[in-house]
Structure formats: C-alpha cells, structure tokens
Amino acid sequence: MTTTQRTQTPSLDYWIHDADQHYYEPDDCYSRHIEERFKKKTMWIDRSNPDTPGRMYVGDERCQFFSVGAGDNIGAPGMMKAFLQGATEEGGSPSLNPINGLSVPEFVDAKARLARMDEQRVESSLMLPTTGVGIEPQLRAPKHREALYPSVRAFNRWLEEDWGYGQDGRIFGAPMLTLVDLDEAVVELERLIKAGARFLVLTTGPVDGRAPGDPYFDPFWSRVEEAGLNIVFHIGNTPFGEMYSKPWGLRPAPPSHRHSLMEYFLAFTERPVMDTVVSLIADNLFGRFPKLRVLSIEYGSGW
C-alpha cells in the first residue's frame, strides 16, 4: 500500500473560531497608563544593552516567569516540529534560530492580525496575554503588592486601546483581574463590563488563603454571571510552585522554559487547573451561579 503525501494545506469550507490566540505585548503594556509613582514598581524591561534581549523586571526584582522580554526570542512558526524531533538548542528550548516576535506586524498590531485572520479563514479569535500570564502572582508578594491593582488596571487599558474587547465581533481581547482585594476587583470588573469586555482572565489557585469559590467572593461572581462574562484560566504563572514545589525542595518560581519534570508536574500544567476546577465544583460555585462559564485553555485535558 502506498500513501500520498499532502502537498497543500487542508482547507475547510467554513471559517473557524480560534479560542487561543496571543499577541506579544509592547514594553509599555503595564506602564503606559499607570500612575507615575508606580512606573518603576510594575513590570518594565531593561534595554540598556542593545546586543541582548531585554531583561524583564517587576519593580527592582527580576521577573521570575520570564527572564527576558517574552516576545524577544521566540521559536519561528513551525519550530515545534523540530523541537519534538530533538533539533533544538542546548537546554531543549524550541527557540532554535529564534525570531523577534515584536518585529512581526500581526503579532503586535490588530489590523495586521485581522488581515492574517482573513488569509487563514479565521472568523474570530479569543486574544490572550503572553507577558500578562506571567506577572500577577509575583505582584502579589508583599514587596510588590501596592502596584498590583494599578498594574492590572493599566494593562487592561493598554489592551482596550491596542486590541479591543471584541466590539468588531472578531478580536476578543481578554482583560485580566485578580481577587486579592475583593472591593478593588469589583470596581475594575464594573469598568470592564461598561467597556464591553466579554472574557476575563484569572490566575488558577487560591487567593490569600481562600478558595476562589468561597462565598466571600460571591459579589464578584454574581456580577460576572449577570454580565455574561466568560472566565478564562490559561496556563501561566501561579501560586502552585510556592504551595507544592517548595515543600519538595524544588524551586517555587522557575522560569517558564526551565521547569524540571517534577516542577512541571506539581505546579505548571494540569495540576493548577485541576485543583481549581475541583475547588469551584466542591464549593458549589456553579450551584449558586449556574450560568457561569469557565474556559480552561492550554492546560491539557488528561485530568
């Protein structure tokens, strides 16, 4: 028996909806709209050495999840095949012969992305953070916490300005929020609802010793349900390293591309979302708010 190798990209007779697209954020995604006194307390990128990728900081501390600018040094489209075949740089990164994502128009510009979506027959896309999924847990630390909500608000205003929340019916930017301070969270939630947000990204895991489905947070969940927002849990930085990796003698906050096997298992992929979803169910969140919708994205499905 012989097989015929496909020489063309398979085509569909309909356009698709893509629920996991990303942009690469500009350096000022946190600082553009933040109050002046927080500009050096939020996420910023040191580009004093033009010969190396930018070094990411949260305040005066190196960013834990991304050591360099998230878009500075990435694998080119199609590199995952080489990664799976072992054709990678030392250390196993899929970034062999990397490119700068910030230099690719459709990675950073909504109009260019729409043109690419038209070319690829993508009707609409859920547009998610890249840098954004790695910052919030570090900002929870006591030394950074005063900049947490100013940073979240500033990021959301940048997103609203550069990508939008889906008013065009095609690119649905998903703002971020944190439940660390319930009152602050509800205030920003109301602003996002008025601005037209349809999706909302939260970090998996507990919040300062409370389960996210604790009735304490019901004022937040009630408004989310009433407004019809969709909650998104996307793989990224979480509190799980501190909770589970550290007691095993492992690093609580390794860089995203340098997890050991055990760190990966305990704190990075399926464990955070599995524990979070089980917690929401066990706390009867969906019994109290049956119209809530939650998306688990890039967290696997083996669980």
Model-identified regions with their sequence ranges:
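Helix-coil boundary/capping segments in enzymes
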Residues: 1-303
